[in-house]
Amino acid sequence: MIKVTLKDGSVKEFEAGLSVYEIAKSISEGLARNACCGVVNGKVCDLREEVKEDVSLSICTFDSQEGKDAVRHSISHVLAYAVKRLFPETKLAIGPSIATGFYYDFDKDVAFSAQDLEKLEAEMKKIIKENPSIEKFELPRNEALELMKDEPYKVELINDLGEDEIISFYKLGEFTDLCAGPHVMSLKPIKAIKLIRSAGAYWKGDEKNKMLTRIYGTAFLKKSELDEYLDAVEEAKKRDHNKLGRELKLFTTDENVGQGLPLLMPKGAKIVQTLQRWVEDEEERRGYVLTKTPLMAKSDLYKISGHWDHYKDGMFVLGDEEKDEEVFALRPMTCPFQYTIYNAEQHSYRDLPIRYGETSTLFRNESSGEMHGLIRVRQFTLADGHLIVTPEQLEEEFKGVLELIQYLMKTLGIDEDISYRFSKWDPNNTEKYINDPEAWNKTQDTMRTILDHLKINYVEADDEAAFYGPKLDLQCRNVHGKEDTLFTVQIDFALAERFDMSYIDKNGEKKRPYIIHRSSIGCYERTLAMLIEKYAGAFPTWLSPVQVKVLPISDKYNDYAESVVKSLRNKGVRIEADYRAEKIGYKIREARLERTPYILVVGEKEAANNEVSVRSRKNDDEGAIKLDAFTERLLNEIATKER
């Protein structure tokens, strides 16, 4: 008999060799009926998996993300099966589940049309109705290669696997696919599927490889859940920063400028400027000193920092090492420059902590397939910073960084949209990371202890660290469900040594400082994108590029309108007036479409009484208010950063 510890902490005994499904069934017929997959000792597994020793076990239903993933992964195979039925010459690539659905990549001479997607969806429903059996099996490498010999992408994937790795397949009726799983036991409970769209995608995400056709879809157990999801997708389209940001004239792009190089228009630039001034003032209030460093440096600097060895492919290099005496590169990070500033003078323990901040323009050579609007770009502006601390100061300063970030998030109204990810190294990936296992383990243990002391609720992620140390990533989902890193805090164990940074301790001895890397508000472009989507372009008044719009009823009242503009502008309000000879109703509608927080209509009565007729986003038509009273209210709303 083996002991199985269930999610609720209870321990049950079972015969060795029972499957996860059989264990679920022994607990409850209903649980087995609703089960999609299991988690054994923290690892997601198939319900078919046999349990042969003492384990901890969770049974996952569709209510869990693991359960949703198993259902949608299974349906991605149904899509591939349908493609092979209708377009048998198509070659198969990969088909994983993703946050809100699944995709499958195909190599087809002619891309799938909208009509093709309709046919495929109908064929998928037909397959689900047939409810073919789902079987998992394993093969040795030579037999696996023989089975997949007509599928070049599958052959490549098999060859990529390590010699000792298990090569598993799933058979769905007459269709077989290379797959590690997990998959559901039966398609019968899946009542609602939808193919969303198709797009281009490079094989393995590498633009040097062939462009494939990716079909996105989703699946639910109930039609009502699918309908709710599709409604959310439509709302997301309306909020998409790529669409809304252009409509509101916040940013634009141009093919002659280049991909991943957005141009902030005056309104977008005003929002970023407002954020930047606020962040820099807040950092200085908390003891930061601001620096201004070059946009490029000689390769020598990046060789010291390790960027040249571990990050060169992500940098824009100016010159040829073989031909030029000096080779420069645009900076991907600010850290080497601020460390050079630190080393410009000797420091005592009394000088520490030193908190450097900088609004940094950075450059990263992202692949074309990765770039998206303001989220993923090649040039961006980062609220960068590095804290040089003693070992005794590390936890308190880390806490101070988090308090700053949490204050900024709460003020922006995005604190509830954030999740925390503790990003660790992969000891097998020595090309990506500095190869010092002892230092990695020590630093990761230190960060974990700090996070636990601060009661941060986080998940751990392997192979997501910076090359020089572990980090805490603050993740935010965009309207399409994709998770992006908005803020990051890192503990650096390597670069203080590489730059020979030191301080003199109280005993007069030279010591290495610890370094905390952090971005207080992250990349301004990405934060702007998140805020566009969060507020659907209707930013809080303090952040709105135009806070007030004055609309004279006719040109007879232009002089009074201009006096209102001057009065408020002199007090720092961002204000415009619309003097066009258009009907007032038209001008009001247009100002509303621009998401202007306050619209002030002025005519004969308002001019005579020094008033303004106020229309606000919150209260609509508020009637006539004395200009002084409105000014006081507006300035208070801006000063308190009311949302």
Swiss-Prot record:
Q: Pfam families per the record?
A: HGTP_anticodon, TGS, tRNA-synt_2b, tRNA_SAD
Q: Give the main EC class.
A: ligase
Keyword annotations: Aminoacyl-tRNA synthetase, ATP-binding, Cytoplasm, Ligase, Metal-binding, Nucleotide-binding, Protein biosynthesis, RNA-binding, tRNA-binding, Zinc
- Name a GO CC annotation attached to this entry: cytoplasm
Residue ranges constituting the TGS domain according to the UniProt record: 1-61
Q: Which reaction does it catalyse?
A: tRNA(Thr) + L-threonine + ATP = L-threonyl-tRNA(Thr) + AMP + diphosphate + H(+)
Q: Which cofactor does it need?
A: Zn(2+)
This entry's comment on the bound cofactor is: Binds 1 zinc ion per subunit.
Region (Catalytic) residue spans: 240-540
Q: Which CDD domains match?
A: TGS_ThrRS (cd01667), ThrRS_anticodon (cd00860), ThrRS_core (cd00771)
EC number(s) in its UniProt entry?
6.1.1.3
Q: Which residues bind Zn(2+)?
A: C335, H386, H517
Q: By its UniProt entry, which PROSITE patterns does this protein fall under?
A: AA_TRNA_LIGASE_II, TGS
GO molecular-function terms, A-Z: ATP binding; catalytic activity, acting on a protein; metal ion binding; threonine-tRNA ligase activity; transferase activity; tRNA binding
| GO process terms (BP) | threonyl-tRNA aminoacylation
Highest taxon, organism lineage: Bacteria
Subcellular compartments? Cytoplasm
Could you list the residue ranges that cross the membrane?
Answer: none
The text of the family note is: Belongs to the class-II aminoacyl-tRNA synthetase family.
Q: What does this protein do?
A: Catalyzes the attachment of threonine to tRNA(Thr) in a two-step reaction: L-threonine is first activated by ATP to form Thr-AMP and then transferred to the acceptor end of tRNA(Thr). Also edits incorrectly charged L-seryl-tRNA(Thr).
How does the record describe its quaternary structure? Homodimer.
Name this polypeptide is given: Threonine--tRNA ligase
